[in-house]
Each structure stands twice: as structure tokens, then as C-alpha cells.
């Protein structure tokens, strides 16, 4: 009974021990096998997965000899397969452009033609050549015959230059036009100088120049017309000196201003001189004569030189002696009437055959005043010198012998 359990224990131990050892060996073997098998398995499994991504050198060393040639053979196979297709496509392309483009080698123009039809598919390679030639042909008329670019740029430049010309030169052109027609500043300066100091010279020019026009009927009347005309050309040379329009315009304006100034002066003098003249009627003609002479001479001595005025008066007196006897109211001009009346006052013994009466003295003084008015109104013939004054003066001369009392004073007042 003791041996059996011992045997059994031994068997158990043996069975157990070898079992453990065996198990351990088996486990080790299994573990080694397990290690070996997975080591072999991944070597077999990894290369196909790793080859396309990146070829491992270890695998290439073991299996690369087998798998590398197919890898190396596959790309040349693809290249060989793709190359005939590409060559066929290139051949097709080369034939078309070669047929379209004359004198082109089949390969190089084919490659060039490949680029061109893709970029410009509808135009085909012939169109670029055609386009380049007409573009060159178009550039010639564009630049020379019908230059749109050249025209646009000059247009902008011209517009700018024209704007500057319109801004700047109008002042120069306006100055030139003023210099041709006479600058306004010169007109005003001349007018002011003539108003201040040169009015006397203008008065010299005004009286003879316009006494010549009404004095034209005096040609058959005697020495008075000669005296007026001798003074006319003597004083007219300044008018003849001025050939330009500007000077004539200036002189005309100066004469108009002189007329206006003289009218104002004489109207004031006449208004002041009427009443003392009418009050001095009973005085002797000798006293009234020099006063009248002073009145007659004062407006003219203001304007011309004193010597010319004296010469003019002397010639007028000589001519008026003859005219008082011969000339009637029909042939008398306004100037001759006033000059005759002035002569009658100056030289009382030569008065017409009615004698010097008290009634004649107002006539003479009125004639003096009329002469002053006429000197003012001769050139312009302003509305003051109307038919009334002519009629009154003609009446005074037509009836020299009839003694008229102071009834003419209202007539004179109406004139004024």
C-alpha cells in the first residue's frame, strides 16, 4: 500500500515534473514558434504594403531581388506603353500642323503646335501666323495713315495746351487789341490831361475846325471867312498829325468834353451876365462896348492864345463892315450874325444907318451873348440852338434901324 502511493506520487511528480518541464518546453517552443512565425509573417506581409510607399532596403536585400525587377520593369513597361500612345498623338498632331504649316519639321513644330492649339483651340496654329502678319499690316496704318494712338495722345496734349492758351494769352491778345484800337487807360489819361491843362489847345482845335464847317458859306462873303479859314489850317495841323484811329478817337472825345465844359461855363457866365447887361442899357455904347468885348473875348481867351484871338477879332471886324451893308438874314449863317453884332458893338460909328439908339444897345449886348451861346453851341448844334434863336437873330439884323425897347428880354430868357 505504501509503494502504490509512492509510485503514484512519483508518477505524479514525474508526470507533474515532466508535465511542467514539458509544458515549459512546450511554452518556450510555442513562444519561439510564435516569435518565429510572426517574424516570418510580417516579412512576408510587410513588403507588399511597404513597397509602394517606400521600398525598405532590408526587404529589397531579401526580397528586393525578386520584387525590385518587377518594380523596375513595371515603369519601363508603362513608359513603353505610354510612349507609343504619346508618339501616336504626337504623330497625329504633327501631321495636322505639318500640313497646315509648310516647311516645318515634323517633330519640333509638332511639339510647338501642341502648345498652340491647346491655348488657342479654335484658331489652330495657322491663325497665330495669320494674326501676326495682319497685326503688322494693321500697325502701319494705325501709326501713320490713321493714327488713333497718336491722335488720342496729341488730342489730350492739345486740349491741355489749348486750355492754357485760353487762360493766359487772352490777356495778351486783349492788350494787343487795345493797343490797336487804343487802350482805355490811355483814353482816360488823355481825357484827364485834356480836362486839366490841355483843354485850351483842344479849344483851339474845336473852334476853327468846326467854325470851318459852318463857315463854308462864308466863301463869297468877304474877309471874315478868310480870317476864319486862315486860322483853320493854322490850327488844324495837330489834327493832321494824328493818322491813327486811337488819336482821332481821343481828340473826338476831348472835343466833346471841351464842348460840355465850355457849355457849362458859358451858360453860367450868360446867366450871370444877362442881368448886368440889361441894367447897363442906358449907359453909353462906349462903356458897353468894352464890356461886351471883354465878355466876347473872355470865353475865347480862355481857350486859344491871346494873340490868335486878337487877330481873329481884327479880321472879323474888317469883314463885318462889308457884311453889315451887303449880307441879309437869308445868307447869314449863325456865326456871321453873331460876329456882325459883335462888330457893331465894337465900332459904333460904323453901325448901320439907323444911328445908335438906346434900343440898339440891348440888341448889341444880346448879340454878344448870342455870340457866346453860339461859340458854345456851334460844334454840337445842341437843342438849345433851335430855329427860335436863328429867327430872333435874323429879326435883329433884318430890322437894325427900328428901335426896339427892352421887349426882347423875355425872348432871351426863353432862349436861356
Swiss-Prot record:
Biased composition (Polar residues): 8-20, 382-397
InterPro entries: FAM21/CAPZIP, RCSD
Ranges of Basic residues composition bias in the record: 159-176
Phosphoserine PTM sites in chain numbering: 17, 68, 82-83, 105, 108, 116, 120, 123, 126-127, 135, 143, 177, 179, 216, 244, 267-268, 284, 298, 333, 351
The keyword Secreted is annotated on this UniProt entry: no
Matches recorded under Pfam families: CAP-ZIP_m (PF15255), RCSD (PF05177)
Keyword Isomerase found: no
Phosphothreonine PTM positions: 124, 336
Record's subunit section: Interacts with CAPZA2 and CAPZB.
Protein name: CapZ-interacting protein
Post-translational modification note: Dephosphorylation results in its dissociation from CAPZA2.
Domain RCSD: 227-330
GO CC, one annotated term: actin filament
GO MF term set: actin filament binding; phosphatidylinositol phosphate binding; retromer complex binding
Tissue: Highly expressed in skeletal muscle and more weakly in cardiac muscle. Also expressed in several lymphoid organs, including spleen, thymus, peripheral blood leukocytes, lymph node and bone marrow.
Annotated spans, Disordered: 1-84, 98-416
First and last residue of the signal peptide: none
Summary of the function given for this chain in its UniProt record: Stress-induced phosphorylation of CAPZIP may regulate the ability of F-actin-capping protein to remodel actin filament assembly.
Biased composition (Basic and acidic residues): 244-273, 292-349, 360-372
GO BP terms in the entry: cellular hyperosmotic response; protein localization to endosome; retrograde transport, endosome to Golgi; skeletal muscle contraction
Domain of life of the organism encoding this protein: Eukaryota
Keyword annotations: Phosphoprotein
Amino acid at each position: 500500500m505504501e509503494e502504490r502511493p509512492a509510485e503514484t506520487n512519483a508518477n505524479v511528480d514525474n508526470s507533474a515534473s515532466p508535465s511542467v518541464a514539458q509544458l515549459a518546453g512546450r511554452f518556450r517552443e510555442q513562444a519561439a514558434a510564435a516569435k518565429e512565425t510572426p517574424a516570418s509573417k510580417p516579412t512576408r506581409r510587410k513588403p507588399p504594403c511597404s513597397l509602394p510607399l517606400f521600398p525598405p532596403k532590408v526587404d529589397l536585400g531579401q526580397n528586393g531581388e525578386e520584387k525590385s525587377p518587377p518594380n523596375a520593369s513595371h515603369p519601363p513597361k508603362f513608359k513603353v506603353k505610354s510612349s507609343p500612345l504619346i508618339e501616336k498623338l504626337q504623330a497625329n498632331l504633327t501631321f495636322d500642323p505639318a500640313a497646315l504649316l509648310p516647311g516645318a519639321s515634323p517633330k519640333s513644330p509638332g511639339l510647338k503646335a501642341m502648345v498652340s492649339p491647346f491655348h488657342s483651340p479654335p484658331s489652330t496654329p495657322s491663325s497665330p501666323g495669320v494674326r501676326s502678319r495682319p497685326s503688322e499690316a494693321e500697325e502701319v496704318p494705325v501709326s501713320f495713315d490713321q493714327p488713333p494712338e497718336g491722335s488720342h495722345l496729341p488730342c489730350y496734349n492739345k486740349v491741355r495746351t489749348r486750355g492754357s492758351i485760353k487762360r493766359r494769352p487772352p490777356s495778351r491778345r486783349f492788350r494787343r487789341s487795345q493797343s490797336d484800337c487804343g487802350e482805355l487807360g490811355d483814353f482816360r489819361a488823355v481825357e484827364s490831361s485834356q480836362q486839366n491843362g490841355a483843354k485850351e489847345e483842344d479849344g483851339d482845335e474845336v473852334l476853327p475846325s468846326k467854325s470851318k464847317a459852318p463857315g463854308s458859306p462864308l466863301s463869297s462873303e468877304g474877309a471874315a471867312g478868310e480870317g476864319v479859314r486862315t486860322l483853320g489850317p493854322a490850327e488844324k495841323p495837330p489834327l493832321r498829325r494824328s493818322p491813327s484811329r486811337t488819336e482821332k478817337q481821343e481828340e473826338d472825345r476831348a472835343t466833346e468834353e471841351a464842348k460840355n465844359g465850355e457849355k457849362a461855363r458859358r451858360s453860367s457866365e450868360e446867366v450871370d451876365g444877362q442881368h448886368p447887361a440889361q441894367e447897363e442899357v442906358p449907359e453909353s455904347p462906349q462903356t458897353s462896348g468894352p464890356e461886351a468885348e471883354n465878355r466876347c473875348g473872355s470865353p475865347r481867351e480862355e481857350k486859344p492864345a491871346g494873340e490868335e484871338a486878337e487877330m481873329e477879332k481884327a479880321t472879323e471886324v474888317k469883314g463885318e463892315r462889308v457884311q453889315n451893308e451887303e449880307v441879309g438874314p437869308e445868307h447869314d449863317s449863325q456865326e456871321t450874325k453873331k460876329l456882325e453884332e459883335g462888330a457893331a458893338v465894337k465900332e459904333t460909328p460904323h453901325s448901320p444907318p439907323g444911328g445908335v439908339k438906346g434900343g440898339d444897345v440891348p440888341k448889341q449886348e444880346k448879340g454878344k451873348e448870342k455870340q457866346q451861346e453860339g461859340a458854345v453851341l456851334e460844334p454840337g448844334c445842341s437843342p438849345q440852338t433851335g430855329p427860335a434863336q436863328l429867327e430872333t437873330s435874323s429879326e435883329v439884323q433884318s430890322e437894325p434901324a427900328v428901335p426896339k425897347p427892352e421887349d426882347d428880354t423875355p425872348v432871351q430868357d426863353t432862349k436861356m
